[in-house]
């Protein structure tokens, strides 16, 4: 059930979020404005990080309360231990 706060969540994101286990640790690659992580944190009790290359999108993520790392994915993800996440998302 999507609350009023997330009524505008893209239908494809809502569909994918359905498959994420409540309370899981999530890494959202290319997280954009943080909408997906915001939803997962608020509605499913998930924790995790978003990774975004675009500097202009970082403030919106922070405003939403998403832990975000500004980085080009070409640099790899060595900062995270193996098995640090239950789910990894990469949506466009």
Can you say where each PLM-predicted feature lies in the sequence?
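A short beta-strand submotif of the Rossmann-like class I SAM-dependent methyltransferase core
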Residues: 90-91
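Conserved N-terminal segment of class I S-adenosyl-L-methionine
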Residues: 1-83, 87
